[in-house]
């Protein structure tokens, strides 16, 4: 701006200067006048699923909420990055194992795998699961006592035994039963989750002998703490369920230590005490499940026949409720995908690119495996590739993985912008699908 222009501008009043042009001046304001608002994320579609907000994060990846645009069912998705899995010992193997196990399990107390989606370009895998509103450990942490009333603990424990009995009937040893791996639905149904370290016994195995364990240290039995080469897999789960019952009824752990070595030393000795307020029936059940000798440790059938298990307990204390969401403080745990769904219904073809993001190269694997991976039970002895009769991985748009476009995301966007009719048609069909589901 030269001297002449500045002199001319000096002749204007403040109100007139404001109307000259916002890009001409930088107006300084007091910091108290600034309203800071978090940037609103755009809606994101992964195949037929509308992405919601973050539910939690673990060592393997993030867990987010999802909405199925066809059924309007609430889902949870575990987002796994291949690069991150490679940095975790047995990371990729554990994920593949969990998918192979979950795809053949159907029980009300075992988490259900709904879909497996794969993005080759981003090297991401999406494990779509049934939605659970809260984890048991989160509920325990929300109260000072860190425990449940006996009535509530009994209800959860009975469901845990139901789910555990089903897993054992399918020849599966979970190996990591603990409150952190037990999820709850909105109606209070318990779901056993996280089968990443589980082991499927051979169909013709003589017994339940196992040789490896990767479970949480505080829930491991003496035979593992003492370093035995082989052990009974089912009795490991019984022990872990016993530690879980001890924890949810007392708020304590039967064995503790300043470090893992001291913890395993205490577990290896097998000496523990039970608070007196537990009462004789519960104390007897805990001693049976936490028996040092695996051969004498309670079986599922003995647990079911125990007086404490069969007794109908009175509701003497207030139940521990599902706590508010730690992220939003929403006590109702409302569906986080709703705001993004509203954005899609406010659709304008001219604002298509600003409305939502779509991951195009999503592969839906019909057999719940990573594209190119042959399930162990279906692989031939000679290691040949998938047979002609086996299901193939297909993309959401109907193409096969080999037919996927190698264009970058920027190139695909440019291609879409050069063909506005195709872009508008694609977006309109997706939103029309959502609108139809909402009306139904």
From Swiss-Prot:
Ubiquitously expressed in all tissues tested. High levels were observed in duodenum and skeletal muscle, lower levels in liver and pancreas. This is Serine/threonine-protein kinase STK11. The active site is at 176 (proton acceptor). GO terms for cellular component: cytoplasm; cytosol; membrane; mitochondrion; nucleus. The keyword Metal-binding applies. Catalytic component of a trimeric complex composed of STK11/LKB1, STRAD (STRADA or STRADB) and CAB39/MO25 (CAB39/MO25alpha or CAB39L/MO25beta). It catalyses: L-seryl-[protein] + ATP = O-phospho-L-seryl-[protein] + ADP + H(+); L-threonyl-[protein] + ATP = O-phospho-L-threonyl-[protein] + ADP + H(+). Residues 430-440 have a biased composition (Basic residues). Residues 49-309 form the Protein kinase domain. It is found in: Nucleus; Cytoplasm. The modification Phosphothreonine is found at residues 336, 365. Its cofactor is Mg(2+); Mn(2+). It is an enzyme of class 2 (transferase). GO terms for molecular function: ATP binding; magnesium ion binding; p53 binding; protein kinase activator activity; protein kinase binding; protein serine kinase activity; protein serine/threonine kinase activity. It comes from Gallus gallus.
């Amino acid at each position: 701006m030269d001297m002449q222009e500045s002199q001319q501008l000096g002749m204007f009043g403040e109100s007139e200067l404001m109307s000259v042009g916002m890009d001409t001046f930088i107006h300084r304001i007091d910091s108290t006048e600034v309203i800071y608002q978090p940037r609103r994320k755009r809606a994101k579609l992964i195949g037929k699923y509308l992405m919601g907000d973050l539910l939690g994060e673990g060592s393997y990846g993030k867990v987010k909420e999802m909405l199925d645009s066809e059924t309007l069912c609430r889902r949870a998705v575990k987002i796994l990055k291949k690069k991150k899995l490679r940095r975790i010992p047995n990371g990729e193997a554990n994920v593949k194992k969990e998918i192979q196990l979950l795809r053949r399990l159907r029980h009300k107390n075992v988490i259900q795998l709904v879909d497996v989606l794969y993005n080759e370009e981003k090297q991401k895998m999406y494990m779509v699961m049934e939605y659970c509103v809260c984890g048991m450990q989160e509920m325990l942490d929300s109260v000072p006592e860190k425990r449940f009333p006996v009535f509530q603990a009994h209800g959860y424990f009975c469901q845990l035994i139901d789910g555990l009995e089903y897993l054992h009937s399918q020849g599966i040893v979970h190996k990591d039963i603990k409150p952190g791996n037990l999820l709850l639905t909105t109606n209070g149904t318990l779901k056993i989750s996280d089968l990443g370290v589980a082991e499927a016994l051979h169909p013709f195995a003589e017994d339940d002998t196992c040789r490896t364990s990767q479970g949480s240290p505080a829930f491991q039995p003496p035979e593992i703490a003492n370093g035995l080469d082989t052990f009974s897999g089912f009795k490991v789960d019984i022990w872990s369920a016993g530690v879980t019952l001890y924890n949810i009824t007392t708020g304590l752990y039967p064995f503790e230590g300043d470090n893992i070595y001291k913890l395993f030393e205490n577990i290896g000795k097998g000496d523990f005490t039970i608070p007196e307020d537990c009462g004789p029936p519960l104390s007897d059940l805990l001693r049976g499940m936490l028996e040092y000798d695996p051969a004498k440790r309670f079986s599922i059938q003995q647990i079911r026949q125990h007086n404490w298990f069969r007794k109908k307990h009175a509701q003497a204390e207030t139940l521990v409720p599902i706590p508010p969401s730690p992220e939003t403080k929403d006590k109702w745990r409302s569906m986080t995908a709703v705001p993004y769904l509203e954005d899609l219904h406010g659709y304008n073809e001219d604002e298509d690119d600003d409305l939502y993001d779509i991951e195009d190269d999503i592969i839906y694997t019909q057999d719940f495996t990573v594209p190119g991976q042959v399930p162990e039970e279906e692989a031939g002895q000679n290691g040949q590739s998938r047979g002609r009769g086996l299901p193939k991985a297909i993309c959401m748009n109907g193409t096969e993985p080999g037919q996927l476009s190698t264009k970058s995301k920027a190139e695909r966007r440019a291609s879409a912008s050069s063909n506005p009719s195709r872009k508008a048609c694609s977006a309109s069909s997706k939103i029309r699908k959502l609108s139809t589901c909402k009306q139904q």
